[in-house]
Amino acid sequence: MTSWLCASNMKFRINKFKIEKFQIDNSDIVGKIMGLDINTCDLLTKAVVVDHECEYYWDSKVCICGKDPLTKLKQLEKVECLDFSKIAQEITGGIISSESLRDMYDYISRMLYDSETFEFPLEWDFTFANRYILVPRSYENNSQIEMIKGFCFFADELPFIKPLIVKFFTEKNPTIVY
C-alpha cells in the first residue's frame, strides 16, 4: 500500500488542516501511471529552460536559482514539457505540495544519473544538456512560490520515465492536498 499525507479543507483556506493518511493500493498506482497517455490527458506545460550558472548543484537545497526573479536568470528558451504536478493530479486526483513536487523532479533526475537503478532504453537518445527548467506552479496559491525548479522531459519521453514515476509514488510518500 502507498500512503500520502493529506490535508483536507484546503479550498476553504482553514488554518488548521485536518491531517490524515490516505492509502491506495500500489497496483492501482502502477495501473494509473502506466495508463497515462499524452494524447488523452493534459500533462504538458510551458517551462523556462535556464542556463544554470550557480556554484551549487541545481537540485540542492542551497541553490538559489529558483528563487531569483526570471529577469536575473539567463533564459535559453521556453519549451513544452511534461508537468509533474499535472501528472500527480491525474494519478491521485489531488494536488501535490510544492515540496513534494520539487522532490519528485529531484528524485527522477537523480535516478537517471544512477546506472544501477535505471538502464536507459536503447531507443532513448537522452542527454542532460539544457534540461534545467523553471516550471510555473499553477496549483498552489502561495505567492512565495511562483516557479519550481525542475528537469525537462518532453512528451515523447513519458514512456521512458513511467517506471521512475512509479518508484517515486510507491516509495517516497509525497504530500497530496485534496
UniProtKB/Swiss-Prot annotation:
Q: Which family does it belong to?
A: Belongs to the mimivirus L39/R874 family.
Question: What is this protein called in UniProt?
Answer: Uncharacterized protein R874
